[in-house]
Amino acid sequence: ADASSVQIRVDPNNEWIEIEDDGIGMSVEDLNGKYLRVGYRRRDEDAEHGCKTARGRPVMGRKGLGKLSLFSIADVIEVQSAKNGGKHGFRMTAPDIKKAVQDKRRYHPESLADDALTVTQGTKLVLHEIKRQRLGKGVAALRKRLARRFSVIGQANGFEIKIDGRPISATDRGDLPKVQFLWTFEGYEPEASTIAHVVERESLPAR
């Protein structure tokens, strides 16, 4: 998405989750040909950028399957995106997808009405009918998982993730205070405050 900021809002009653970025957004063609297409191989099929985004970031993901993981925590997914002055959106539901598979027919998401589109820049996902048992221990656990998953979070990388207005940082990982010996790849610089206690540190050549 080439976003510099991702905002995550979690309903206190776990009725919905919103994820909104300020990236480049998607056109109707992008939504149909890339987002909705399972198995889209960006590295091979994006002739303009390939393995790098427009901002020069390494592309994440492999098989175009990550989008399906949303259905592990919610049965209804709304996708809204804005690009080049146009806004578009649709709704997908797990029961309708299963029914289409059973009937051996192609599934078509439900288009969102123009007055239902609230996105102004980038892409917005809204999850409904949350599977509460999959949320684990709530927001605290989500912060830890995201901090451990994305090493690019932080001002040094020009990328932030906020949950309910509070930025995620390396301290949310929860594991660095236990580290005595640290090896990092060249180009990655942990926040100084998180590694002040490290006994020995070494930088390895970039992969």
Description of each model-found segment:
Residues Q7-I8, L68-F71, R143-G154, V199-P205:
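Short linear motifs in intrinsically disordered
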